[in-house]
Amino acid sequence: QIQIFKALNSQIPQMGHLSLMTDIDGGGLSKRIGSLSIDELKKQNIEPQALTSYLAKIGSSQNVELHNSINQLINEFDINSFNKAPTKFDHEFLKNFNIKFFQLINFNTIKERITENKAYFTEEFWDFIKTNVSSIDQIHEWLDILYGNFYIDKNNNFETKNFYLNCFPDQPIDHLTWSKWLENITLKVNDKKINIIKNIRAFLTGKSSGPELSSLIIFLGKEKIFQRLK
């Protein structure tokens, strides 16, 4: 680069570089072998804010924290805080940090990016769902599960669904409804609670994991619960 500036009879700027970046095992990162690319990270739903926060601090003595703006990263940048030893790019850490991004991000910032069932994206919904999502696509998916055109398989485990339905407490839904419902079921059937919980979650959401069922059934409401169990 210096030779190019000399050949152009241009003033040579003051330059420097950070240490070599490797993968977590110490292997080289190369765009030629596709070991890492912005396009690949985008496909993995890594948020730009999470990525820039991570890249700005790895290899330095500063803690990796979620930034509010690029200007914040610029103001905090200190070349003297970086090590001379090779820096390891930890892909798993980045993915976990991306999950943390959704737990910390401001409600209004996220709401601007919601394009489906936006009327249902409330602060209450966001507090309910944010620890179970790691991408905007997953937020849209949960909005669809709760408020959209969620597909209900009426031909699957009819007897089990009907049994659970008959055990549902005959009272307005609140945060105690779930524990009462589960108690009603366990008193009448010899099955492990973990299996019952797994079945009900699958029947109501089509998922094997997700938010607490005690809150989920409140968001769903009795009408939708009954529809999905009939």
What kind of feature is each model-predicted range?
Residues 154-209:
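C-terminal accessory/binding modules appended to enzymatic or scaffolding proteins
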Residues 6-152, 205-230:
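Catalytic adenosine-cofactor/nucleotide-binding cores of aminoacyl-tRNA synthetases and other
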